[in-house]
């Protein structure tokens, strides 16, 4: 009886080990977020003028996210519906359900990666680039992100080029209203974390291309706005201090 028991146990061990390894190599997660928020606006964003009535409403975010991960590949798809309670009819054939994230990340090695698709860009204190998650809709970008990381250094290069639709001819005139607020973007971000000092530092350079062409003729003209700066943090002995400085360059106001 004992011999049979030990034989069965030994047969099970390889199967258990294989199952555990497979689970670590291939991970699939799914999350659901329902986030209603009631607001009473009595002078929101600007003082309320005399005679104007306050506003009240309930908005809601319903988001479904699915993510797959293994050693060299990570993919995520996330879709959401954002709206105000009562905004849609009870019978609605045209639902407003959009993709807020749809990207794939390929790890070329332990240090280098490329991430392509619709993604959230969140850096430092999120003053320049952030996910804006406090907003009911959040914020996303259609971009290619190339990165390097080691225990002390992180470097990201972000590239984006936006158009309103597929066209055969007509140039690259871009209508920013109701779409992404820029025509193209190139961003470099570097973060350094020291093992010996309580200081961390980040450097950011962003070049934004903004469409300023002729809307009537669709003649495209792009002006560029550069933003550069640093973000520094200090954490030691109960102290937590952070500071940021950014500077913008533009030949002509856009």
Language-model-derived ranges and their functions:
Residues 39-45, 86-89, 123-128, 164-170, ...:
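Outer-membrane beta-barrel proteins
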Residues 21-23, 107-114, 132-253:
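Signature for the C-terminal beta-barrel architecture of outer-membrane proteins
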Residues 19-118, 144-149, 155, 230-244, ...:
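Beta-barrel outer-membrane channel/assembly domains of diderm bacteria
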């Amino acid at each position: 009886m004992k011999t049979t028991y030990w034989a069965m146990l030994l047969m099970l061990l390889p199967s258990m080990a294989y199952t555990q390894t497979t689970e670590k190599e291939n991970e699939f997660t799914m999350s659901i977020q329902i986030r209603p928020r009631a607001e009473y606006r009595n002078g929101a964003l600007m003082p309320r003028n005399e005679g104007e009535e306050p506003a009240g409403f309930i908005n809601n975010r319903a988001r479904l996210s699915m993510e797959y991960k293994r050693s060299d590949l990570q993919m995520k798809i996330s879709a959401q519906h954002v709206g105000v309670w009562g905004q849609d009819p009870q019978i609605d054939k045209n639902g407003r359900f959009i993709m807020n994230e749809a990207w794939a990340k390929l790890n070329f090695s332990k240090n280098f990666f490329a991430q392509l698709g619709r993604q959230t860009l969140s850096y430092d204190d999120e003053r320049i680039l952030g996910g804006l998650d406090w907003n009911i809709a959040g914020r996303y970008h259609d971009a290619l992100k190339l990165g390097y990381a080691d225990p002390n250094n992180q470097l990201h290069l972000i590239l984006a080029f936006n158009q309103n639709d597929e066209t055969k001819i007509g140039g690259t005139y871009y209508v920013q209203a109701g779409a992404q607020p820029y025509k193209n973007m190139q961003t470099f971000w570097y973060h350094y974390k020291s093992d010996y000092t309580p200081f961390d530092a980040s450097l950011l350079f962003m070049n934004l291309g903004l469409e300023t062409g002729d809307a009537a003729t669709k003649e495209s003209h792009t002006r560029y706005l550069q933003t550069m700066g640093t973000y520094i943090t200090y954490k030691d002995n109960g102290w937590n201090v952070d500071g940021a400085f950014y500077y913008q360059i533009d030949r002509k106001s856009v």
